[in-house]
């Protein structure tokens, strides 16, 4: 027989492989791998055991055990005993026509069990106690069958060499589980599936199943005998299964798990399957004791495809049949399979994690008689074809997929269905599945996540009977109502993404049911739009103002009388469809006034929203909808009364009203947006209920329109209730002459906007009645009449056009309330119209009443009274042509009244009435104004007014210049007539002629081309109504003896003229202050002109020719460019203010009294000066006059030299007197000139102007911080003498001394001395660092000083800085020494100080040329920041330097030495200096003058010294030497300012210093392996010779340069310092030092660090 692989032998021998494992492996090794020849053993005539007895064995050896994996062929009618421990055989082959017993005495594995050649007979299997028979079903191939060998190793073909199929178990007959526990295992080598299971036929039956265990570990087994259900334990492994397709008992019932039997699913995943098939003439009812599946294991399938069947809990329907609870006790799955017309009934509770309902063909039905619950994470899937599922109890289907099938779930009365239902999970675009509620019920989510939809693209949710179906969560489904009593109740937050009542119920019809809300909800589709009974009876909103029903459909259709109910607390309906027109065919019922909202704010102007129903209640107890927001839609309110508290209209939105009654408490709209349309197509009337407001004053509607009636052109009548207001930019009519307004409810109505006239279309008529007041605030155009009755008032605020305006009962009033000018246009009438009670003017705007047409000569409006009231002061009414002021020719007298007074913030004003085209006579006693309410009368044409009233409480004016004649004859003896002005004011239109025939007091203006004061008549003019005179007054009608008197404050126009008809006649008297025009002329002077007021003043604007001119004590102001005084005598005894004009004395003698003085103004900008000219023939006599005041407005340029002159009195030889001392009052920006008054040689008086800039600026500088600067005075003189520079001209704009000093001082001083000194100090610092290095290296050749060699000193301003380096033991080295210096030079000798901060580093390389000579080279890099102080504070300088040096030291005779260095450095200097600039107004701003230039500095030093050991550990080294440095700056030009950039010339500076001092070094101190060398030093540095050259600089245009300030710094300075060096070894050395440099007003502190590498 085939041999096992060695590794398997070892495993088995070691006891590490179980019998079943070994069997599988052996089978695989012998068959699948083909590792051995297939063996066959055939039974013979004796009893057969596989240990070797009864088989076709060889003679020797005999009775050899049947090899493993051999085929056992039953060749004789003898039983077979399997007694090989852990035996494993390829299979049993029945080759005898007998039923054979096979006893299993040891655990055995068998492959196939076939009766292929004797199919009428079977193997009966008997399992001994505790034994396991494992069946693998392993077949053999034809190759194996043909090559099979017997025990003699001779080929003995099995099945004649034909293959035996895998899983061929046709030979299995009775399986006896014995008297004690035994196990049957199906572990198929080639596993079968549910679709192609291993079938155990009818002969395969179980005996003694109560002792057996059946394990299905690999494969799917289908059994035909109900005896398998008697097995004590059936274990089904993961992915494996057993199918009961059993024979029938007497009631076609299969009992499962009876008598303590169990079916378990023992795999890790619990995916084993139990299939129960219902079939004809076999088991159709499956009674289950206990429950199938559990612990989330086991998939149970109930299949009634062939015949109706029941799966029943043996304990009753209230017991679980699948699983045990909805948590961990659930089965893994439950599958129900049905077919068309077939029913599967589950009579027990079902708890399965995943449930499948599948129908082979539509429509199978599944009835659940009790709870179905898949748990919180469970699923339900509908598959294959549509099916119908009916539940009877509350159930949870979990996540349910209808699989795009027309499946239906039916929920009975009062039950709840939980789940999350999807029409087609694999294709979300498909819609499938219906959930039908028989009556009351609830559909709820099975998910804890509120975002998970309850239904998603299922076909429908149906309420088929009377009852309430409660929905919550999100749904994508149609809602269908099948009974008038059907109700869908939507919980708060419910979303219905679908339609309502669009499609008939499954097996039923739609009905007018109801939807109610517990809170907010959304329905996205149409409602009730399928016609017929599809319309809804009602929708009831939640009783909560915060809750919203969102409707996304285009058709919201209610049944006849259907309502959308807003409960007591309101709520909101939100319409969201933006793609379609929307129809709402419901009444909107409001429970509480001003509650509820309809929100259509998202609608666009392309959409029409139609409400075919009532909204609220209009009546004694109004119940208004709180708000209706139409968005931008076109909304039609077409059927029923409407009551809305707030109508919100979005941009471009429109609302159409029909023939009903509308109460709109207010509208909300953006200004100029929104449209209301009246289109009553039924009865031609629209009624606006009391309290309606369309638009508002602040936000009027864009338009209110009367819609078209088409060809019928029938009038549309708007009945306007009490308090109704219409506000719109335009109120229009589509059809011409259509649209009438009836205001008859009393109260006040406002109509605001342009009414009619658009596109030429006029409205029809207006009727007022019942005491109603109507305000038309805008233009209004009507083709028909306007009637006003029963004490009603028409208030007009804009242009108004009508056929006529009348009052049949004489009680109607027209009131003008306009604020601007308006025109009322009426038609001439063929017959008289009924008179108005009154025309009232209440607004400040003018009113023109105009008449057109030629129908007749009667006026379109008549009244006997015009009244000015309220705000009409200043308003003007133009009466129609032909109506005069008097009553002649009028049917009724004309009265003009006023209650508005005449006082305004700016003075006197009146309301006025203008007539035209007719002459008027005003009789004495006619009522026109009163003493406290003066009115105005005017002529609008060239007609006459005769005034016969003694007192006329009116002023008279004319509209057109040089038109109109007024004759004033009202005066009587001893009582002058009174009138309140003739003309409205200077500059206004003049009367053509005014004639005074009697004495008069004119309490206003005279504005006339000519006003004649008849001979002997005296007119006093000016008063409360005006003080102006413009035109001409003629004194006398023939003899020139008329008289005019002007009251205080009279204002005559400069061109006005008072003349006389006869020379030297007529008088003119001024009773107070006056502006005077022209009086008389050289040929016809008047008799006298007198100024009689006390302390008055006269502004002379024209020439005066009079025999006598007496100005009294008046102060005279010359207000024209040349005023001439001529005639006989002139008396002046006050101030003469010439301003910039000329007063000419042309003739006669002028006498000036003691109070006479002269004031004049000199304007340098144009050279104008007020002056006096005394012509020949004139004489001025004066004693010494008062102070001569000369006002100078001097903004002129002072860029001149010498003196300028201006004449004050010309013809001074004819001036007999002396002017008083001058008082100059200079204004303007020029401080740089002096003024004087002199009398020239020709006796003229002359004003002088002299340049004084040098003295002014010198004083300004002296009193400023620049005052002490050396040499500044010379530079100031140089600057002010260069008058051609832009800087000089800019200086002349300085307003004060401080600005002047800062401007000039910044230019004439500089910082060059400070910069040069700072640069030289940096060079000396670098020389000091070189001296330090030399002092160290010279000790290399001096052994006697080695002990005392001290460390390097700090930086000093000489090459002999004390403190030399410590001893070097090498010939050369490289070193670097960074340093930092902070220096402060205070102000000294007037020279501004500075603060300088320098950072730098010196790097050197040197070597010993011999024992006594050292040489080296070094570079230095420095940066110096200088901040200048004192009067140069704000100036800054940056210096960046680079230097190259050579240095050396020579040891002389013992202890004497000499050392020196040479340096060459280049420096880049960036200087920023503050300058100033004045704008045209003299405002000073700061600017920066930037100068960039290069500097070169070079020099050298030489020092000698002596080392002296003063005592042990102390070395004293006195030193002395000289240092020389020279510095050179290049030329440069500043930039950055407007007028103050300077050109700076190059300069050279040098200095030679004597240096004397000493240093003291101590002996070395050793600290923790470090050698420390201390040192102190002191030196005196004295400047021997040298100079700091002065910088020369010039401005553009300047010739003589400014010279910089000289150096005033101290010549002697003192240096004190100390340092220490630290060595860690011979190569590396570090150091630190400090030095102080002190001189007069100068202090510098320097710190140094050192690092040195010795080679």
From Swiss-Prot:
Recorded consequence of changing residue 413 to D: In strain: Indian tick typhus
One cellular component (GO) term of this entry: cell surface
Keyword Secreted part of the UniProt annotation: yes
Alphabetized UniProt keyword annotations: Cell outer membrane, Membrane, Periplasm, Secreted, Transmembrane, Transmembrane beta strand, Virulence
Result when mutating residue 75 to S: In strain: Indian tick typhus
All residue ranges annotated as the Autotransporter domain in the record: 1367-1655
Pfam family, one: rOmpB_passenger
Residues cleaved off as propeptide: 1335-1362
Family: Belongs to the rickettsiae OmpA/OmpB family.
Role summary: The 120 kDa surface-exposed protein is a major structural protein which may play a role as a rickettsial virulence factor and/or immunogen during infection.
Name used for this protein in its record: Outer membrane protein B
Protein source organism: Rickettsia conorii (strain ATCC VR-613 / Malish 7)
Lineage: Bacteria, Pseudomonadati, Pseudomonadota, Alphaproteobacteria, Rickettsiales
Encoding gene per record: ompB
